[in-house]
Amino acid sequence: IDLPRKDRKHFIKQALGEGFGVLAEIGKKDTSIKIEPARAVEQVFEGLENGAEKVIIEGRDSGKGVGIYNDQGTVNDQLLQDLVQGVQDHSRIIIEAPQTSQHNYLLIHLGPNVNLGNVQPHDVLTLESTRVGLRGDTLKQCLINAPRSFELFAMSRNNDG
């Protein structure tokens, strides 16, 4: 759905006024429409400024060809870096990640507290085991990348106030 900015703002404010919690979403399910980093960061800030608790980064059910993913489902690292650096506090975004390889990549690069959406029910236990370091396939990488994760976490904590 293409909603003009003023309509998105109106609907968020209306839902908040009715006592609902609000999540906004950016990105399109259409694989021909790619996310532009600067515009995506702008949309995240707009959603948060309008009162959304978090902003979801579209990833579809397939995790292929939309959002931060290429047609094979691999994370576009530069786009992810641009988003995280632009938003600064990645605790305010939820990244749709339906594939296990995407969970692992995001946990390794953004740390165990990254917010993931569109996780398949049969993947939840594996994902949570990975988050707490109980899976051998990502534990070593998490330890290697821990300084980067802590740096990103510290950046997000500094922006809390």
Give the ranges of each region predicted by the language model.
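Active-site-adjacent beta->alpha loops and helix N-cap segments on the catalytic face
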Residues: I1-F20, K34, G63-L80, Q102-N104, ...
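Glycine-enriched alpha-helix->loop->beta-strand junction motifs that scaffold or abut catalytic
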Residues: L16-G21, N50-E53, Q88, I108-N115
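Hydrophobic faces of well-ordered beta-strands that scaffold small-molecule active sites
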Residues: V22-I26, V55-I57, I93-A97, V114-N118
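Active-site mouth loops of central-metabolism enzymes
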Residues: E25-R39
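C-terminal helical cap(s) of enzyme catalytic domains, especially alpha/beta-barrels
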Residues: G67-D82, H109-N113, V124-G161
